[in-house]
Amino acid sequence: MEEVLDLYAEPPDPQQPLVCLDEKPVVLHAPTRPSLPSSPGHPARIDYAYERVGTANAFLLVAPSVGWRHAEITERRTHTEYAHCLRYLVDVAFPQASRIRVVQDHLSTHDPSSLYATFPPEEAHRIRQRLEFHYTPVHGSWLNMAEIEIGIFERGCLSRPLEGLVDLCQRTAGWEAERNAQRRTIRWQFTTPDARKKLARLYPDVKSELD
């Protein structure tokens, strides 16, 4: 926990940007009957009966200090999709950075081995050399600032039923462009001293052990 909090407390470094990564499964629903458009004297009528038409996965990448985020929509959530997100970070999002510090949870696919399971060894090694991984504690996903952005993503893209993967991708692209144009940053205020005071129960009682 303190490793992540100390990282958040550091001043921004353009050569070593901090990026928080998380993902969310998405259920795709389509209306069972088409909506009726409005007509003179009558409002549009929307049928609220929907059927499930599939699932997708949304990767959220957030650089909290610079107001940048990227949402990658995939049909599956395997090590392959995760590895491609890492390559996007290195080659597209921050090509000039010497090292990208990635905060993420302990999901089984969130591991450098996913790179080697996806790309040739030389390519996997190239990407891995540019990344530095930091993990939130088990049951401590609230420490990942990407979760804040996921909540905003849900309200912006998932509050209405989705008719399919294309609909989700279109909504996501519009949401991402709008959010990045706003350049909204995240100011994390919970610090290591706060954790030692407010979450003291999570620390071992060293004094008692020495008595």
Short names for language-model regions:
Residues 1-87, 199:
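Extended, low-complexity cationic-aromatic segments
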Residues 19-21, 101-104, 134-136, 189:
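Short beta-strand segments
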Residues 32, 167-177, 181-211:
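C-terminal domain-tail junction helix/linker
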Residues 45-51, 123-145, 160-163:
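RNase H-like polynucleotidyl transferase catalytic core
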Residues 80-101:
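Short, basic/hydrophobic alpha-helical segments
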Residues 97-111:
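Acidic/histidine-rich, metal-coordinating catalytic segments
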Residues 138, 146-164, 178-182:
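Active-site proximal helix-loop segment of RNase H-like, two-metal nucleases, encompassing DDE(D)
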